[in-house]
A protein has these predicted regions:
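Family-specific signature for flavin-dependent thymidylate synthase
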Residues: 1-305
Length: 305
């Protein structure tokens, strides 16, 4: 989990003011140019008004491009189900670099000399060496978790023997991948053997409406799969840093429903007990009295705000 990094690459810098101005434009005779010069207090008020009226179309004018680096393909496949976004993902042909690093570390520990890059000594010979090093690492009792962790994601539920078994299976799969490359199978076909746990990176562009109405409510929730929940909470922290007047109100589905049916309060207020839930139950059917505990659980599993 600690190797998953979420960073904000680019965003609409004046997004808060732009959203407030767009919201006011729909109800004003003034020109958008004049509206944009509104004081900061008015920006805050118009943003709150979009929550009160569930008027989120102005939020589409502010756009955010961010990176999820080191997550698994299990996570990225869930991520791309969000249709109102643009994605660019590292090709699986280029995740081979992390597999090769695992093979080279194993080779170094075992005293096996493997070329650092396939082209240095003929690709097939290099692939044979990588495969041999990985297989020997599994047989010889080297720490498989240490070797596999840079290349693969381990679910936190795996501990003890289960963790070691998973690591050995990851390394064995990588060894077989290199065995296929060594006999001339293309990378496009050999990659069918690589587990979904392999790390990847993906660049995502979403507008603020997609973030507050769909991605963050669904993926910050306790019911979301642990890895994409971690990505969502990390992203929320980055968004609050740059546009607090927009994203301090955002959160899991319980918070979104509460904030669109009553006077909105910041997510931190719900976490710290300064605001209470009045909805009878959340969209996941958790009753009112259990919502805050569920929210704290989601936040705790994601590393706490």
């Amino acid at each position: 989990m600690d190797k998953i990094r979420v960073s904000l690459l680019a965003y609409t810098e004046d997004g808060e003011r732009l959203i407030a101005a767009a919201s006011k434009t729909s109800l004003s005779r003034k020109s958008p140019e004049k509206i944009l010069s509104m004081p900061d207090e008015e920006v805050e008020e118009w943003i709150r008004e979009t929550w009160r009226r569930q008027h989120f179309s102005p939020w589409e004018h502010s756009v955010y491009t961010w990176l999820a680096d080191g997550c698994s393909r299990v996570c990225s496949h869930q991520l791309v189900r969000h249709r109102l976004a643009s994605y660019t993902q590292q090709s699986m042909r280029y995740t081979e670099g992390s597999l090769r690093e695992a093979a080279l570390e194993a080779a170094g520990l075992l005293g096996i000399e493997c070329p650092r890059k396939p082209r240095e000594a003929g690709a097939r010979r290099a692939y044979e060496c990588y495969s041999m090093a990985l297989r020997e690492a599994v047989r010889s009792g080297l720490d498989p978790v240490r070797l596999a962790k840079p290349a693969f994601v381990f679910p936190p539920s795996l501990r003890g023997e289960a963790l070691v078994e998973a690591a050995n299976l990851y390394l064995e799969a990588a060894a077989r991948y290199y065995s296929l490359l060594a006999v001339g199978v293309s990378r496009e076909d050999a990659r069918f053997l690589i587990p979904h746990a392999v790390r990847t990176r993906i660049v995502v562009t979403m507008n603020a409406r997609e973030l507050v109405q769909s991605f963050l409510p669904l993926r910050m929730c306790t019911r979301a799969q642990w890895e994409i929940r971690l990505v969502a909470w990390k992203l929320w922290k980055r968004l609050v840093e740059v546009h607090p007047r927009l994203f301090k109100w955002a959160g899991p589905r319980c918070v979104f429903q509460q904030n669109t049916t009553s006077d909105p309060r910041p997510l931190v207020d719900y976490l710290e007990g300064r605001a209470s839930f009045t909805i009878p139950r959340c969209p996941e059917l958790v009753p009112r009295e259990g919502i805050r505990a569920c929210l704290l659980h989601a936040n705790g599993r994601a590393g706490r705000v």
